[in-house]
Amino acid sequence: MAAAQEADGARSAVVAAGGGSSGQVTSNGSIGRDPPAETQPQNPPAQPAPNAWQVIKGVLFRIFIIWAISSWFRRGPAPQDQAGPGGAPRVASRNLFPKDTLMNLHVYISEHEHFTDFNATSALFWEQHDLVYGDWTSGENSDGCYEHFAELDIPQSVQQNGSIYIHVYFTKSGFHPDPRQKALYRRLATVHMSRMINKYKRRRFQKTKNLLTGETEADPEMIKRAEDYGPVEVISHWHPNITINIVDDHTPWVKGSVPPPLDQYVKFDAVSGDYYPIIYFNDYWNLQKDYYPINESLASLPLRVSFCPLSLWRWQLYAAQSTKSPWNFLGDELYEQSDEEQDSVKVALLETNPYLLALTIIVSIVHSVFEFLAFKNDIQFWNSRQSLEGLSVRSVFFGVFQSFVVLLYILDNETNFVVQVSVFIGVLIDLWKITKVMDVRLDREHRVAGIFPRLSFKDKSTYIESSTKVYDDMAFRYLSWILFPLLGCYAVYSLLYLEHKGWYSWVLSMLYGFLLTFGFITMTPQLFINYKLKSVAHLPWRMLTYKALNTFIDDLFAFVIKMPVMYRIGCLRDDVVFFIYLYQRWIYRVDPTRVNEFGMSGEDPTAAAPVAEVPTAAGALTPTPAPTTTTATREEASTSLPTKPTQGASSASEPQEAPPKPAEDKKKD
């Protein structure tokens, strides 16, 4: 069964690595200029799409952030007796725009981050008067929303990778946002927010070619740009939609006590201490795939600006979504989500039935629990294992090989840091298992280069002295007759029809693709050993059960969420192998009362032993304990026949009751 757990773990790591191997995209998120996000290369190698579990993990992470933000609100505002500047107590503030305040909306578009040219008619994009703060019934659709669409004439600087900003002003009715108009401008009657509306993405170019012909299918223009700008080019991208939300909130916030990340949106007036209405630029539902690059060929850009009121609760959700991951302290390039991962979560939320989505989230939590239990039982099984009878040692070594190939592949493709760490931990666990299946020691007599001690590996006696080693060697010999021809065919196909960065990348890509396609075959040697031993009692059934349940959950996700056909086939073939294990468990049932070929049974060692009555000199019968047999756990019981009990010798002088007849031998399976 070691082969099953190793191959199953490698399959999960391989799919996870494939989902994040190319250049990725990260969102702007915060107000103002953000770090450039990364876009996918124009000629990426063929990679599997992110699996269902990656999509669900993204949803669960967002739910956790939402819960954390909500917990701050349940704590309530800070007490008013907190000391402020000069020792005076801090008091709760109020919204400078009371509910039902009449206000005007002014939207300006400019290439300058700080806007001052209010007299330029070309900069004014939209002006909407007589809006009511907190009105949810006006507008064309009676939802309080308004929108405006227009084509923007973009200047040459924006065409040449420059920035463009949106400046939004809300003023109370009768006032103007221009500070130079003294009669119409009031500081406490004007709220302003701006943001860069284009997004910078890194476009990575990987110089790949056919290693035999030297030809490439990459766009010649892209090759020229890569020669001019290098392998990574930062390009401005555009999305035609953005929503301006004003939060309908009158919470008595206390300055200095607003929990993050909400504190970056609540702006207090320095003189009055009250806070301005909260303006939020909402682009959460803008899918990454809908962004397109801005270049010299575009003379204008379409822009649709929507205005909608936003409740406090929904604003908390969006603010939580825009919160950067806690892993970002490692750097934006180390932890990032791909375009597919970001869009798949949003599409799932938009298109999936709410009941089905709720069921999927619940099952995802169960999947996480099973994943943890499988990991825990796997470690416990190998840590407490004393005998290797019935276990495939070669499968453990093949699992180490699989893990190393996956690790080298994701390092070569510059996958994000979190995936690299998780795969590296998996490699360490696989290496630790080697110490449990072999005797590993440092040979200080035969040193490497005369300096470093040499590692010595030796098979354990419980493996050598049993028939398991013979069956293990036989299984892998038969397996090699299938794997090596398949590996050769796949290597030729990869060399003839796919492009690679170099020979090293070709070797890793070829091995990675081969393991992804045919790795499930390595689960079969354990089936062969079980067949030869006519027993499955040596297998870690708890760990196997958790992994089987997780595989069935993966099947559910694969058919509920849009997934590649090859991934669905991969889940199905793993199910077939697990069903074979279940069939073997059914036909090779374990009888806990039998003693196996190792002299062990599955009886409870604490159970009382049967007693025989022996007559004393006075003729009375006294109980005498019968000899006990060595016991073992139920999982280590075998299907061998029990040994016959020996009869005690009769005394010549005193009569002894005849011993009970031995039970009939049970029928072999």
Curated annotation (Swiss-Prot):
Residues 376-390, 438-477, 524-669 are cytoplasmic. Glycans are attached at N28, N119, N161, N241, N295, N413. It is a multi-pass membrane protein. GO terms for cellular component: endomembrane system; external side of plasma membrane; membrane; plasma membrane. It holds the Pfam family CLPTM1. GO terms for molecular function: GABA receptor binding. Involved in GABAergic but not glutamatergic transmission. Binds and traps GABAA receptors in the endoplasmic reticulum (ER). Modulates postsynaptic GABAergic transmission, and therefore inhibitory neurotransmission, by reducing the plasma membrane expression of these receptors. Altered GABAergic signaling is one among many causes of cleft palate. Might function as a lipid scramblase, translocating lipids in membranes from one leaflet to the other one. This is Putative lipid scramblase CLPTM1. The lineage of its organism: Eukaryota, Metazoa, Chordata, Craniata, Vertebrata.
